[in-house]
């Protein structure tokens, strides 16, 4: 399987094991398979049997083997078996699917170690990184940015692993107390939390700036686990497959997905699954007040907001005004025209955005690629949480409420079951839950102690050079071997 950059018109091929540890391509683009594997009826039938008889980890090995041909299949099976286990995940199904109400289902992605859907990819990445580093006798320094859940998922997946340090940037004061406690309370000598004076997009910009410095990246062995890393999307494709299987009984049945998203990572995996031939009807983008993606799918205008115009909302993991994975979809939408994508994302996005409203390709977003969208407000979230709790006796977090609210908007127009992809357990967003139902969510027993742990975090200015120096100093003063 060859991989190409979204900005490389020459389509220089790369191998999976090389892009696994790197993140961004050298030209600043994002990696995608040169061609998507194609599924047929026999493959889908086989996967139904694998999930039923062998479980999620075995299905994951089947899916991932389509994208990875430079790791032996038996090793892939061992890696997925370690990544997706019970009781590491709180359900033997790993990703259960339950019916919420008429034609709307919940895909439970928050059964993992940090109660967030990011665990689905991060647990696999932890195993893959350690495997590949050991194979190469190398070390890596993972640099990432998080608006909430990515950081804790990455840190719990990478802690204690041979050859790995983690440097995670967070927007100072913009995460919930539970999210801060999960990250900052983690006691591991090779986990480094950095609270940056800015919003999430500032953190993401610093990560991209550091990664774009080829010399610094090489000298300090910088890698990435944010959703720009292809392996994360690859891992997420698996639960689209498993959720489709659990919701249907025959291969000609389609489903739709309503996906809360800010960074376009989770739903990009759905796009890839659909391109492979998984029977998906609609991919519904659910945003909060930071609705840059909803605006694009309604109008064709991709208008990046400034930090000052990025709203602080009650679904904070989606408080993103520049969707870093969106480039992958636009690459496909524009017929894989890397020269044009390079102009759009290398130049025009830096100047505030671009418009495809008058481009004939824009109509394909809905007609050919199945996308739809909607937005949710704080009032919508609170009302949805309260309604789902009082009528259905189910408690959902604010981001999942965004997904349910938007799914309900589309239910009458979509003739398939809609699976809302859960993003986190309610305990991570207690203030909003209290506002919605009048009481705090119960803290699962496995998380009871984290709120009392002392914090380990460094405050830094919104400055790339300051972050670089911090990384250099930390590497010099710690060992991962």
UniProtKB/Swiss-Prot annotation:
User: Listed GO molecular functions?
Assistant: pyridoxal phosphate binding; threonine synthase activity
Identify the enzyme class.
lyase
InterPro entries, sorted = Ser/Thr_deHydtase_PyrdxlP-BS, Thr_synth_N, Thr_synth_N_sf, Thr_synthase-like, Threonine_Synthase, TrpB-like_PALP, TrpB-like_PALP_sf
Query: What are the transmembrane regions?
Result: none
GO BP terms: namely: threonine biosynthetic process
Q: Which reaction does it catalyse?
A: O-phospho-L-homoserine + H2O = L-threonine + phosphate
Q: What is an example of a Pfam family matching this protein? A: Thr_synth_N
Question: Which CDD domains does this entry report, sorted A to Z?
Answer: Thr-synth_2
So which cofactors does this thing need?
pyridoxal 5'-phosphate
Source superkingdom: Bacteria
Alphabetized UniProt keyword annotations: Amino-acid biosynthesis, Lyase, Pyridoxal phosphate, Threonine biosynthesis
Is the keyword Lyase assigned to this protein? yes
Q: Which residues carry this modification: N6-(pyridoxal phosphate)lysine?
A: 118
Enzyme Commission number, as recorded: 4.2.3.1
Q: Give, as in the UniProt entry, the pathway in which the protein acts.
A: Amino-acid biosynthesis; L-threonine biosynthesis; L-threonine from L-aspartate: step 5/5
Q: What does this protein do?
A: Catalyzes the gamma-elimination of phosphate from L-phosphohomoserine and the beta-addition of water to produce L-threonine.
UniProt lists the family membership as follows: Belongs to the threonine synthase family.
**Subunit text:** Monomer.
Protein name as catalogued: Threonine synthase
